[in-house]
Amino acid sequence: MTKDFEPFVYPPANLIAGVDEVGRGPLVGAVVTAAVILDPNNPIVGLTDSKKLSEKKRNVLFDEIKEKAVAWSLGRCEPEEIDELNILQATMVAMQRAVADLSVQPDFVLIDGNKIPQLPMAAQAVVKGDLRVAEISAASIIAKVTRDREMEVLDAQFPQYGFAKHKGYPTKVHVEALELHGAIEQHRKSFKPVKRILGIE
C-alpha cells in the first residue's frame, strides 16, 4: 500500500522553481539535477514522477516543458566530484548549480525529498514532491531524460557494460560486466562495487 500524501499547499510566492535529482544510486556517470519554473498561463498536462512515465511519454513532456516553462536549467556533479564530496553533498551542490543557472531567479524553491541545499532564497523540501508538485515533476522529467540520454551515449562508447539498459544502476548485469571488464573512467570510485573491483578498501 502506498501512503497517500496530503495535496500540496503552495507557499505564497510569485516565482516558484521545482528541483529534483536523478542518478544518486548508479555506479557510473554524473548525478543530474534540474530546476524548472512553470508558466501558470501555459499549463502542461500529464506531469508526474518521471519514473511513473513511459520513456516515450517522458520524451514528449521533456520537449513540452522546455518549450513552455518560464525557465529551466540543469546542474550536475561529475563522478570525480561525487568521489570527493560523497553522493549526498554532490547532489546538494548539483541542485545549487541548477538553481543558480536559471535565467529567471525564483523567489521560492521546492525540492524533492527531505534535504535542502543552501540557497540564496527561501526553500522547502517536499516528500514525494515529484508526485505532488508539478514544478518538481517537470524537473524530474528534465533530469531523467537528460541523464538517460547520457547513458545511451556512454553505452555506444562502452557497449560491454549495458549502460543503455540499466542506466548505470548496480544490476547483476552491470556488476558482472565490471568484474569482467574492470571500471571505466566514468565509474564512481567511492561506490562499494567499484571499490571492490579496483581493490580499494
UniProtKB/Swiss-Prot annotation:
Function: Endonuclease that specifically degrades the RNA of RNA-DNA hybrids.
Chief location category: cytoplasm
Cellular component GO terms, alphabetical: cytoplasm; ribonuclease H2 complex
EC number of this enzyme: 3.1.26.4
Compartments where located: Cytoplasm
Annotated cofactor note: Manganese or magnesium. Binds 1 divalent metal ion per monomer in the absence of substrate. May bind a second metal ion after substrate binding.
Family: Belongs to the RNase HII family.
Main enzyme class: hydrolase
Sequence positions that bind a divalent metal cation: 20-21, 112
Protein name per its UniProtKB record: Ribonuclease HII
CDD domains from the UniProt entry: RNase_HII_bacteria_HII_like
